[in-house]
Design a protein with these regions (language model features):
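Surface-exposed patches in mature extracellular/periplasmic domains of secreted proteins
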Residues: 115-119, 159-164, 206-210, 229-235, ...
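Structured C-terminal helix/loop/strand segments within mature extracytoplasmic catalytic/sensor domains
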Residues: 2-110, 127, 253-274, 294-382
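Active-site-adjacent helix/loop patches that line small-molecule binding or acyl-intermediate pockets
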Residues: 86-99, 182-262, 269
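Active-site SXXK
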Residues: 125, 136-165, 312
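Short glycine/serine- and small hydrophobic-enriched flexible loop segments
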Residues: 148-156, 199, 247-254, 332-339
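Active-site-proximal loop and beta-strand segments within enzyme catalytic domains
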Residues: 154-191, 195
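Active-site-proximal beta-strand/loop segments in catalytic clefts of secreted hydrolases
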Residues: 120-122, 197-201, 209, 235, ...
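Short, conserved catalytic-motif segment at the N-terminal edge
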Residues: 111-135
Length: 382
């Protein structure tokens, strides 16, 4: 019996030992399977992340291209709006405190003198005037109107510049340098009469031109342009204020800018005119000017061809000596004023066109959407 029991125990032990290899194999299999699955899962995560990163990079690249294209389009639109603004005429709403201060300083300076001035920038139409309603004796400034009338009518075919007029004794007056080489009875062309009246302010040439044109015709012509004081006062010179001066200068400028066969010829007479204190030879600035002088009246009206062309009328009661130096000084101050006008205009257009867009771009940078994390966050702007 004992042997039988012992044998039974041994058989049970053998059966248990036979089960262990299977269990070990099962565990090894499961462990191997786990490792395989884990590695596959890791590879999947890596592949997924790489794929995600790749796709997000592509999306971001496309978005960046779209943003850059939009920025370029916006920049082009802004530049067009800026150029439009720059080319617009000046308006009072754009005046800065600095420009106001410059104007006030100029006004305070002018209060020291008996004079009137008017300045008009041709491009922007900015205008500054002082004592503009005061009326002066025109003196030789009226000769500008003689010249414009003759050359305008020549251009329109109403007269020939080479037509002549007889120089008679009744036309001969003082201060007639151009006609000194002519004898009484000589014939003088209209072209030369205008040339002498402008370049050397020949008074006899002026008398002959007024006679040729007709006093009333010349007066009506000045009025038709917008002048209020043309030939008022009982002689062939009349009266003038700075507003009339600008009217004459504007018409002269328009004639010159038409680039007709006569434009440069007439312009050259005014550029070469004597007593021209609006030109600045040191800085290469030319001016198409006509002066006027009688007693204490001393004037300069001109188109100043600076970097930006402007009209300037300075009418004074200062006489030639003080008047000439004062006119030069005022012209320099006007150039400073004009510089401020353009700086003011540029800054105004920059603020108007670019500042709003720049504010929008700043806000756009402050709030950027982080697509990977799935929420909006503020990012530091470098």
């Amino acid at each position: 019996m004992k042997k039988s029991k012992t044998k039974s125990k041994k058989n049970k032990s053998r059966r248990k030992l036979k089960k262990w290899p299977k269990l070990v194999l099962l565990l090894i299999f499961l462990a191997t399977l786990f490792l395989i699955l884990k590695k596959s899962l890791d590879n999947y995560n890596i592949t997924f992340n790489n794929t995600y990163d790749y796709l997000m990079n592509k999306i971001n690249e496309q978005k960046q291209k779209q943003d850059e294209k939009k920025q370029q389009e916006n920049k082009k639109k802004q530049d067009e709006e800026y150029n439009t603004c720059i080319n617009q005429k000046y308006s009072e709403k754009e005046k800065s405190e600095k420009l106001t201060q410059v104007e006030n300083e100029l006004t305070d300076y002018l209060k020291n003198y008996s004079l009137s001035i008017k300045f008009v920038d041709v491009k922007t139409n900015y205008t500054y005037s002082y004592n503009e309603s005061k009326v002066y004796y025109a003196a030789s400034t009226i000769k500008m109107l003689d010249a414009i009338y003759i050359y305008r009518n020549a251009l329109e075919g109403n007269l020939n510049l080479d037509s002549t007029k007889k120089y008679t004794k009744n036309f001969k007056v003082a201060y007639s340098a151009g006609l000194e080489k002519y004898k009484i009875g000589d014939m003088v062309s209209l072209r030369n009469l205008v040339k002498y009246a402008i370049t050397v302010s020949d008074n006899s040439a002026h008398q002959m031109l007024v006679d040729y044109i007709g006093f009333n015709n010349l007066k009506k012509y000045g009025n038709s342009l917008g002048a209020k004081n043309t030939l008022i006062g009982g002689d062939n010179f009349g009266q003038i204020d700075v507003n009339d001066s600008i009217v004459y200068l504007s018409e002269l400028y328009n004639f010159i800018e038409e680039n007709s066969e006569f434009s440069e010829e007439l312009k050259s007479y005014f550029i070469e005119s004597d007593e021209n204190f609006l030109k600045d030879e040191e800085n290469g600035i030319k001016a198409a000017t006509k002066y006027g002088e009688y007693g204490n009246f001393f004037h300069n009206n001109g188109i100043v061809y600076a970097e930006n062309t402007y009209f300037l009328s300075i009418l004074t009661n200062l006489g030639k000596k003080n008047g000439s130096s004062t006119i030069k000084s005022i012209n320099r101050k006007i150039q400073g004023l004009q510089k401020n006008v353009y700086e003011n205009h540029v800054e105004y257009c920059k603020q108007k066109i670019y500042s709003v867009q720049n504010d929008w771009q700043l806000m756009n940078k402050l709030l950027k959407y982080n697509w990977r994390d799935g929420y909006e966050r503020k990012e530091k702007i470098i």
